[in-house]
């Protein structure tokens, strides 16, 4: 229907009337407009893909202080970002009079409009969680690539036809070359209701931590249906933010309350970073179904498997990676002897199958083997050599954060005497080599020392 309407209602939008824009895109109806730009529904001449085209008037931009750098920032930021929850910039076109940003089409509108259409202007906590974890995933990706959004608000969060989130409008984004010598940003920008207190007070600030505050405001809005602080008076709003004078409705769960509190921390030094939420906060965790995710791996029992006499494996969201060498006495290690547990965590967007496969390949060099059978986890001894430490097992637990993001937890069990006293690392186990072997499968490592409850 949209494409038929486009054909019937081609408009003159700066793209040459009824002629395809630079021979590449047929412009249709207007989707929205701002001070200096209009956004049109369009269709690619080659292939027929539906896209959105943002048409920017050069004369108006050049005649307004600060607008030309903003357009350049938006293009520079979007060109370096390729993520399922970040609106994609396909290409940039230009004529003498106009600039055209050809972007991914988000047919679901913006988050603010979606909330406004609801009777109570809020989401159930489960639905709010789904939206919010996608937002956190997108911003974590941006921050890892040196991009701080600086204008995170529901109007700039779009939705596709399936309700998946797309962060948009990077016109105020800060790139690494925006930082001063002190490594901070100094330009106050954004929307006051969603801006961090340090930004409103025009102090030097960390762009990623400012985005974290904005995420806290959005989470509050998703759960409560209104802003945490009245924005009719900015000075009063800033005072209330510093005093944490907000109140969540009684139906909001305690884990969600704690998360809002950590995000709406007026002190940016103690405010939680969005990058740490997926790995560390319990509100984000959701168990994977191993039967559905790893069905292709369960192809029968290994022919050389030896029964592993230990506590039964955890429920269907866990695997054991068994590490052993000839002569290693497993019974002593899994008896009543003192043990130390060392953990590492990382996040990945690879599939569970791919992650487990890569762990298995790494095991060939580090002296362990991954075994998943119909009866559960079993031992498969490796031939040759002796490990330099009394490693008994390393379990791997995968939890779904938000598709396709997984949290992978590695727990290494060793005899107490095989742990160095200095840094708590396990003697002889090559964590650094494991990091190298996993390579691009790992999105980010999260140290165990940071695993305090958020």
From Swiss-Prot:
User: What conditions trigger expression of this protein?
Assistant: By salt stress.
Q: Provide the residue span(s) of the region labelled PPI.
A: 341-370
**Protein kinase domain: which residues?**
25-284
Q: State its cofactor.
A: Mn(2+)
Any one GO BP annotation for this protein: signal transduction
- Read off the PROSITE patterns from this record: NAF, PROTEIN_KINASE_ATP, PROTEIN_KINASE_DOM, PROTEIN_KINASE_ST
Report keywords, A-Z. ATP-binding, Kinase, Manganese, Nucleotide-binding, Serine/threonine-protein kinase, Transferase
User: Catalytic activity annotated for this protein?
Assistant: L-seryl-[protein] + ATP = O-phospho-L-seryl-[protein] + ADP + H(+); L-threonyl-[protein] + ATP = O-phospho-L-threonyl-[protein] + ADP + H(+)
Q: Which residues form the NAF domain?
A: 311-335
Q: Which SMART domains match?
A: S_TKc
List the active-site residues: 151 (proton acceptor)
| Cited SUPFAM superfamilies | Protein kinase-like (PK-like)
Keyword Nucleotide-binding in record: yes
EC numbers: 2.7.11.1
Instruction: Output one GO MF annotation.
Output: protein serine/threonine kinase activity
Q: Where does ATP bind?
A: 31-39, 54
What sort of enzyme, by top EC class, is this? Answer: transferase
- Activation loop as annotated region, ranges: 169-198
In terms of superkingdom, the source organism counts as Eukaryota
- Record text about domains: The activation loop within the kinase domain is the target of phosphorylation/activation by upstream protein kinases. The PPI motif mediates the interaction with the ABI (abscisic acid-insensitive) phosphatases.
This molecule's function is given as:
CIPK serine-threonine protein kinases interact with CBL proteins. Binding of a CBL protein to the regulatory NAF domain of CIPK protein lead to the activation of the kinase in a calcium-dependent manner.
Q: Which family does it belong to?
A: Belongs to the protein kinase superfamily. CAMK Ser/Thr protein kinase family. SNF1 subfamily.
Any idea what this protein is called?
CBL-interacting protein kinase 4
Query: What species was this sequence derived from?
Result: Oryza sativa subsp. japonica
């Amino acid at each position: 229907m949209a494409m038929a309407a486009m054909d019937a209602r081609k408009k003159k939008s700066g793209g040459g009337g009824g002629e395809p824009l630079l021979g590449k895109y047929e412009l249709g109806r207007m989707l929205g407009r701002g001070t200096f730009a209009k956004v049109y529904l369009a269709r690619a001449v080659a292939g027929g893909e539906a896209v959105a085209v943002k048409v920017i008037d050069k004369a108006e931009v050049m005649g307004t202080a600060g607008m030309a750098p903003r357009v350049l920032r938006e293009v520079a930021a979007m060109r370096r970002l390729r993520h399922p929850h970040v609106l994609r910039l396909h290409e940039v076109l230009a004529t003498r009079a106009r600039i055209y940003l050809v972007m991914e089409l988000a047919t679901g509108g913006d988050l603010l409009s979606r909330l406004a259409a609801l009777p109570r202007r809020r989401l159930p906590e489960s639905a709010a969680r789904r939206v919010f974890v996608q937002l956190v995933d997108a911003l974590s990706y941006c921050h890892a690539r040196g991009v701080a959004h600086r204008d995170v608000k529901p109007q700039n969060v779009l939705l596709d036809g399936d309700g998946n989130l797309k962060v948009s409008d990077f016109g105020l984004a800060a790139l690494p070359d925006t930082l001063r010598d002190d490594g901070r940003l100094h330009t106050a920008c954004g929307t006051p209701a969603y801006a961090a207190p340090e930004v409103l007070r025009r102090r030097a600030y960390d762009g990623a931590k400012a985005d974290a505050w904005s995420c806290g405001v959005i989470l509050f809005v998703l759960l409560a249906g209104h802003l945490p602080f009245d924005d009719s008076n900015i000075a009063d709003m800033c005072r209330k933010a510093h005093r944490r004078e907000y109140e969540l409705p009684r139906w909001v769960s305690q884990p969600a309350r704690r998360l809002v509190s950590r995000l709406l921390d007026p002190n940016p030094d103690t405010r939680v970073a969005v990058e740490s939420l997926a790995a560390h906060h319990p509100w984000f965790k959701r168990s994977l179904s191993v039967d559905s995710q790893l069905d292709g791996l369960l192809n029968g029992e290994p022919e050389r498997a030896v029964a592993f006499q230990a506590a039964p494996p955890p429920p269907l969201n866990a695997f054991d990676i068994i590490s052993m060498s000839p002569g290693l006495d497993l019974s002593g290690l899994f008896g009543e002897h003192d043990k130390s547990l060392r953990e590492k965590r990382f996040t990945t967007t690879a599939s569970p199958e791919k992650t487990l496969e890569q762990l298995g390949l790494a095991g060939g060099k580090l002296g362990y083997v991954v075994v998943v059978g119909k009866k559960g986890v079993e031992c498969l001894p490796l031939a040759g050599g002796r490990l330099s430490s009394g490693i008994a097992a390393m379990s791997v637990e995968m939890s779904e954060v938000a598709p396709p993001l997984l949290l992978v937890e590695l727990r290494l069990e060793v005899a107490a005497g095989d742990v160095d006293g200095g840094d708590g690392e396990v003697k002889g186990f090559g964590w650094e080599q494991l990091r190298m072997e996993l390579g691009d499968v790992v999105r980010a490592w999260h140290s165990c020392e940071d695993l305090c409850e958020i």
